[in-house]
């Protein structure tokens, strides 16, 4: 066991305490694998920017190109992946030491430029898609809707009747025609008859009211006369002396 002496302790017979010193291996000081492979590629060395302006301008030139967008981009991104896109990262599991899992293939982004194959193949693909769309456009037929609306019933013609005849006959003859004058005369006669009938009914009601009022006066006069006769009879019976044939006369007077 390796021990280190701590300086600064008194040497007058006191024993020096032995403590383990922190020794590190020079190879383990940094992260594993960084110092062992100085020639490893950087993280973003294999990536490059893609300029889509050429593709957008070329697609904007064709108006009916919606059906070919997926195929164009599939061909665009898959054309350069066939030339060896799978490569192993050098020294993957070997850098960590000991046996490790089987190396996995890493997908590598292709280094495209402005003059590569996708840019050169795109105009031909655009032209082919444009020809296909133009050839399919005349033969295309509109697809039926998923849930067609029920056919609307046409409104049935109105049934002939008096209302329709009356509406059709509203338009009368001209005012200067004899038929119009005859119709006006008939209307005037009917109005006069209705007015005369209302007047007669009103007169009859007034006459009946007068008769009932006169009869009421007669009845009131009759009631007054009977009341006077009753009062005279009472006075007459009060003046008579009590007789044996009138047993209840005194009781009646007492009341």
From Swiss-Prot:
Its main location: nucleus. It is found in: Nucleus. CDD domains: bZIP_CEBPD (cd14714). GO terms for cellular component: nucleus. Residues 163-187 have a biased composition (Basic and acidic residues). Residues 212-240 are annotated as: Leucine-zipper. Residues 141-161 have a biased composition (Pro residues). Residues 1-42, 91-121, 138-206 are annotated as: Disordered. There is a cross-link at residue 107 (Glycyl lysine isopeptide (Lys-Gly) (interchain with G-Cter in SUMO)). Pfam families: bZIP_2. InterPro entries: bZIP (IPR004827), bZIP_sf (IPR046347), C/EBP (IPR031106), C/EBP_chordates (IPR016468). SMART domains: BRLZ (SM00338). SUPFAM superfamilies: Leucine zipper domain. Residues 177-240 form the bZIP domain. Transcription activator that recognizes two different DNA motifs: the CCAAT homology common to many promoters and the enhanced core homology common to many enhancers. Important transcription factor regulating the expression of genes involved in immune and inflammatory responses. Transcriptional activator that enhances IL6 transcription alone and as heterodimer with CEBPB. Binds DNA as a homodimer and as a heterodimer. Can form stable heterodimers with CEBPA, CEBPB and CEBPE. Directly interacts with SPI1/PU.1; this interaction does not affect DNA-binding properties of each partner. Interacts with PRDM16. This is CCAAT/enhancer-binding protein delta. It comes from Ovis aries (Sheep). The gene is CEBPD.
